[in-house]
Regions:
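Post-transcriptional modification and biogenesis factors for structured RNAs
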Residues: 1-129
Length: 129
């Protein structure tokens, strides 16, 4: 849908082979190659071995708005879990950290929604340049 070539999982991430994921994804999970890299640091290293820039999507003090993040070229977006977000190790390994600007009383988004917004922004840039 957004041109995702690979999925790296780390920590206690639920794999695409889990029956609940397969049901939600309506079978599309099998279309994107994936691997469980172990720790967030190992996942970051695997991303770097592929020559990708690592951009974490997380609300931190030093994060830049998503529309200003370095999403051009070959990039890997890192998102954390629903409860705890990106780990400190992953944030430290990231080339940049970006947040999704929001208006309203709630300052967080479901991880699937946040991922879709970040992927759409990355693709929008490719399509408009």
């Amino acid at each position: 849908m957004f041109g995702v070539d690979h999925l790296w999982l780390a920590g206690n991430a639920t794999p695409p082979t889990h029956k609940a994921v397969d049901k939600t994804a309506l079978g599309t999970a099998r279309l994107v190659p994936w691997e469980h890299a172990g720790t967030p640091a190992a996942a970051a290293a695997a991303v770097r071995e592929q020559g990708l820039r690592l951009v974490a999507v997380e609300l931190t003090a030093d994060a830049v708005p998503l529309h200003e993040a370095p999403l051009d070229g070959d990039v890997c977006l890192a998102v954390g879990g629903e409860d705890h977000g990106c780990s400190p190790a992953l944030l430290a390994a990231a080339d940049a950290v970006a947040y999704i600007p929001q208006i309203g009383r709630v300052g967080s988004l479901n991880v699937a929604v946040a991922t879709a917004i970040a992927l759409a922004e990355a693709r929008r840039r490719d399509w408009t340049t």
